[in-house]
Amino acid sequence: MTRNTKHEQRATSSISVFFPCYNEQDNITRVTEQALVVLKKLDADFEIIIVDDGSSDATGQIAEKIADRNSRVKVVHHRTNLGYGATLKSGFKAATKKLVFYTDGDGQFDISEMPPLLPLMGQFDIVSCYRLNRQDNIIRKINGWCWTKLVCLLFGMKIRDIDCAFKLYKREIFDNIQLLSAGALLDTEILARAIRKGYRITQRGVHHYPRTAGTQTGANLKVILRAFKELLKLHRKIRKENRKTNN
């Protein structure tokens, strides 16, 4: 056993890993099997949660077959497509272990980059990662950069990649913050409220890979406008809460 592996085991006694999924029938088996390999090496108590957001393809059925083969895998189903934020909420709600990690079920991240983050949880409460050499089209890159800058400006945060789907949390955080967002703003709200509560956040870079199957969602104009509206609403809400706390 290597020194790093020993550190990783001491850093966590239990971890929940979940994957938000929408129409990922061609990716979810590979992503889950890779996670099982990585997590078994940690020799820790773990669970894997697949959150199927009302997929119109066979994602839900495939996820159930995976769970039937492995008792450490469970599936949460949305009857209809509720959106990314609601899918994250379902994952956090279903998680039962001391640490919670999530990454998307599209295979654009390598979950083997998660274990080196575990020793950081001795000093921090959240590890918020950022994409190295982001493998998306130019429009998504520009949208992501502008969104992150706007969020950081409004909430006074210094986060490099606010919506990077590779984050590790202490489970207790979700018992101590009230989340109002149900849409694309959930990542932002978690970090903003965690900072307000005094939780410690660190950041690390992770590699990002091209999508090899399925279709990206979430970048259409309707979703962007709705997220912008939610952002302003959340900013007003948290600013009002801060004024009450200071008075």
Each language-model region and where it sits:
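Hydrophobic helical membrane-anchoring modules
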Residues: 1-15, 154-157, 179-247
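N-proximal low-complexity "stem/linker" segments adjacent to membrane-targeting elements
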Residues: 1-37, 44
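Short loop->beta transition adjacent to catalytic acidic/histidine clusters or analogous donor-positioning motifs
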Residues: 13-15, 36-50, 58, 71-74
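Acidic helix N-cap motif at the loop->helix transition within catalytic regions
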Residues: 26-30, 57-66
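Conserved donor nucleotide-binding strand/loop of the catalytic core
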Residues: 46-49, 60-94
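A conserved acidic beta->alpha catalytic loop
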Residues: 52-61, 107
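Acceptor/aglycone-binding surface of glycosyltransferases and processive sugar-polymer synthases
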Residues: 78-94, 99, 108-184, 210-227, ...
